Amino acid sequence: GSEMCIRDRNIVIAIIFISVIGTLLHFMYEWSGHNKVVSLFAAVNESTWEHIKIALTPTFIWTLYDGAVYGLNPNYFEAKALSILVIIVLIPLLFYAYQLITKKAILPIDITIFYLTIIISNLVFYYIINMESLHFFYTYISVIVLFIIFGSYMVLTLLPIKNFLFKDPITKRYGIRGHSHHEHKEK
């Protein structure tokens, strides 16, 4: 019926919105003249974490829309939490899996992984939204997971963990210090 048509349209719009905003966020920190506020939401270096972040930012923004449309759905928080976890897990999983074979990063593959992850994330969201109502326990856990993810997302740019996910492969640094403009300034 018409409800399914609206949902089909919403999934396509979600994928396009998240993909376009995510792509722009790859360059936004540079374009903003290295604005600290922009650094919280945009990629500040070429690390895997920053590529996860630029998929999460538009997903969080899209939550303002899908929360209004689907927020009363009993599976909304489960759908949101799992769709976000798909992004957090799938980007590094696919990125490091193909590099085991190629031994190096290949830009067209990286870009494909980014968009493919956004598509899969949204398919997971819409699949769970359309399932039979899940137990309230899962809603409770999902809300906690969402708070943890959002809190971590806000903190990790400013205080990156010193591991491979956060290390810029070019500058070998972390967080904002991993941005290539720091290389030129520090003499």
Which residues does each predicted region cover?
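Short, small-residue-biased leader/transition segments that mark boundaries at the very start
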Residues: 1-6
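C-terminal, well-folded lobe of enzymatic/effector domains
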Residues: 108-187
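Alpha-helical transmembrane segments of multi-pass membrane proteins
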Residues: 19-33
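Alpha-helical transmembrane segments of multi-pass membrane proteins, especially transporters
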Residues: 14, 79-87, 110, 114, ...
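Membrane-interface helix caps and helix-loop-helix hairpins in membrane proteins
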Residues: 73-74, 97-108, 130-135
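Alpha-helical transmembrane segments and their helix-start/interface "positive-inside/aromatic belt" motifs
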Residues: 7-16, 138-145
